[in-house]
Amino acid sequence: QQIPPEVSSQITDALTQGLLDGNFLSLLNAINLEGLLNTILDQVTGLLNILVGPLLGSSNAEIKLQDARLLQLSLEFSPDSKGIDIWIPLELSVYLKLLILEPLTLYVRTDIRAQLQLESDEDGKYRLAFGHCTLLPRAIELQTGNPLSLTVNAVLGTIENTLGNFITEDLGAGLCPTLNSLVSNLNLQLVNNLINLILDRANVD
């Protein structure tokens, strides 16, 4: 069973507008990246010391998120048939200047998966509840038009893995509460539409 397109588009349009009105993408600029940078430094400094000799300190390192874009949202029934998943795809770039390496720019594509579920009160009335919210990295790729140096090649895998862990754990902690607030303030008619969709799916199954 698929979510009717006319219902899905109403809900995704409202969510998209709410994200844009709430400056959702600007939240990325407020996320503390110091921990991420320190983790990357800790993991690659030893290898770089071996490859190129003693390095300067972390004052020569910099990281920032930039060029964030919100892509087309979508809805689908959860695999367990007990709710609806909202998929929110994001694209962004990560600029990284690391010690003596040339500056790197990594392209990131990640999906936010937020689950909506039903809860009932003592009177048997249903309300929409915000369930699990996770970030799933889909792609982390170095943007470059030039051949990679031996040094960059040696540390790139470590950087990509560390960035992936950060997206899954820290970035989700920064963005998911805002999604929760947005869902809590959805138009009542849209909330009722979502509740009815979940109930109808449960009855079919």
From Swiss-Prot:
Coiled coil: none annotated. Disulfide bonds join 133-176. Its main location: secreted. GO terms for molecular function: lipid binding. It holds the Pfam family LBP_BPI_CETP. Keywords: Disulfide bond, Secreted. Gene3D superfamilies: Bactericidal permeability-increasing protein, domain 1. It is found in: Secreted. The keyword Secreted applies. GO terms for biological process: surfactant homeostasis. Major protein in sweat, has surfactant properties. Belongs to the BPI/LBP/Plunc superfamily. Plunc family. Monomer. This is Latherin. It comes from Equus quagga burchellii. The gene is LATH.
